[in-house]
Regions:
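N-terminal glycine-rich phosphate-binding loop and ensuing alpha1 helix
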Residues: 1-60
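Hydrophobic residues embedded in beta-strands of well-ordered beta-sheets
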Residues: 145-147
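Conserved beta-loop-beta/alpha segment of the NTase-like Rossmann-fold superfamily
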Residues: 61-143
């Protein structure tokens, strides 16, 4: 099963940490965010990974070559970050027609990916409540677990 990891952003909110290091290669403890996500998807049965890169993409590429030689990882380069939709269009030749998981490289999570229905033709969106320090967002999760948008 395929997974696309979105790793092309500038990481502006993490400056100055991301001036020389791409956000996916920032460490939490002894492990980068990207490593944590790659290991998580591999351990959940994803055997083909597509990663888009842009800002400091050469550093991500070098990291992957050093650490994931034995895994099927395809890099899709962007001259500048295209955003989520642009990244998917740019990578369309690698995505195919099968079900695919799309995640952000800079997300720290422990979501049980086995809960996703891999045979469905619909989209699953995994969301979490906005934290108290950042209450603005595009959508929220109500007490019933349903997604809603504030007007």
């Amino acid at each position: 099963m395929k997974c696309m990891i979105l790793a092309a952003g500038y990481g502006k909110r993490m400056m100055p940490l991301t001036k020389e290091t791409p956000k996916p290669l920032l460490k939490i403890g002894n492990e980068t965010l990207l490593d944590r996500n790659i290991k998580h998807v591999i351990s959940n049965g994803f055997d083909e990974i597509i990663i888009n890169v842009s800002h400091h993409g050469d550093k991500i590429k070098e990291h992957l070559i050093e650490n994931y030689k034995d895994h099927k990882i395809t890099l899709v380069e962007e001259p500048h970050p295209y955003g989520t939709g642009g990244a998917l269009i740019n990578a369309k030749d690698h995505l195919g027609d099968e079900t695919i998981l799309i995640i952000n490289a800079d997300i720290f999570h422990d979501f049980d990916l086995s809960k996703l229905n891999r045979e469905t033709e619909c989209i699953h969106l995994v969301g979490v409540e906005n934290p108290d320090h950042n209450t603005d967002g595009d959508f929220n999760i109500g007490p019933d677990g349903k997604v809603f948008c504030d007007d």
